[in-house]
Amino acid sequence: MAMAGVFVLFSFVLCGFLPDAAFGAEVDCSRFPNATDKEGKDVLVCNKDLRPICGTDGVTYTNDCLLCAYSIEFGTNISKEHDGECKETVPMNCSSYANTTSEDGKVMVLCNRAFNPVCGTDGVTYDNECLLCAHKVEQGASVDKRHDGGCRKELAAVSVDCSEYPKPDCTAEDRPLCGSDNKTYGNKCNFCNAVVESNGTLTLSHFGKC
């Protein structure tokens, strides 16, 4: 289960309540302290208080402040689904689907085109469970089924602005991001440097560790 939570300073571009997303609850982001960073930008200051909440993106955040910080930093409309950690994923048995082995030794899952959408923990809607299994097996992705039916829009992968990168040196700030390559990047700087190296093929899967 993805979890985002550390002591961080995030770019603070707005105050007040986060938008009330589907099934979500408003979080008053204006109650959290802010400061000014070296670049003169207002930043939101969060601590490590362990009061986990589940965001509408399916990620468990350490506390309300961290949810606000990620949402504001990346311009999302993620709000609070409920207090406590996000619920466990729905079990699925990928071994029940037929498969074959390619000439180069890779296992390929054989799927039909039946349309029975499921939502993956990566925020992607798959046409059916078999196709989710195919992605998991063939790409080695750490993705599971969150629920039957398509993902809500809050779960869609967030576009990260990497226009100011690459940068030769990144800070040690620990605000993890999970990339579409199933690798965890320590912060936005590390992630964006990797995006540049990939010629833009790398995207954000979700906040927190993979």
UniProtKB/Swiss-Prot annotation:
Temperature curve summary: No decrease in activity observed after heating for 1 hour at up to 80 degrees Celsius. Retains 20% activity after incubation at 95 degrees Celsius for 1 hour.
Source superkingdom: Eukaryota
pH effect on activity, per entry: No decrease in activity observed after incubating at pH 2.5 and pH 7.4 for 1 hour. Retains 20% activity after incubation at pH 12 for 1 hour.
Transmembrane segments: none
Site positions for Reactive bond 3: 172-173
CDD domains documented for this protein: KAZAL_FS, KAZAL_PSTI
Entry-listed glycosylation sites: 34, 77, 93, 99, 199
Site (Reactive bond 1 for endoproteinase Lys-C): 48-49
Signal peptide: 1-24
Listed GO biological process terms: response to steroid hormone
Entries under SUPFAM superfamilies matching the protein: Kazal-type serine protease inhibitors
Marked site: Reactive bond 2 for trypsin: 113-114
Compartments where found: Secreted
Disulfide bond sites: 29-68, 46-65, 54-86, 94-133, 111-130, 119-151, 162-192, 170-189, 178-210
InterPro entries xref list: Kazal_dom, Kazal_dom_sf
Principal location class: secreted
Domain Kazal-like as annotated: residue spans: 25-88, 89-153, 156-210
One GO MF term attached to the UniProt entry: IgE binding
Record's GO cellular component terms: endoplasmic reticulum; extracellular space; protein-containing complex
Keywords: Allergen, Disulfide bond, Glycoprotein, Protease inhibitor, Repeat, Secreted, Serine protease inhibitor, Signal
Role this protein plays: Serine protease inhibitor. Inhibits trypsin.
Record remark on domains: Avian ovomucoid consists of three homologous, tandem Kazal family inhibitory domains.
Record-given protein name: Ovomucoid
Species name: Gallus gallus (Chicken)
Lineage: Eukaryota, Metazoa, Chordata, Craniata, Vertebrata
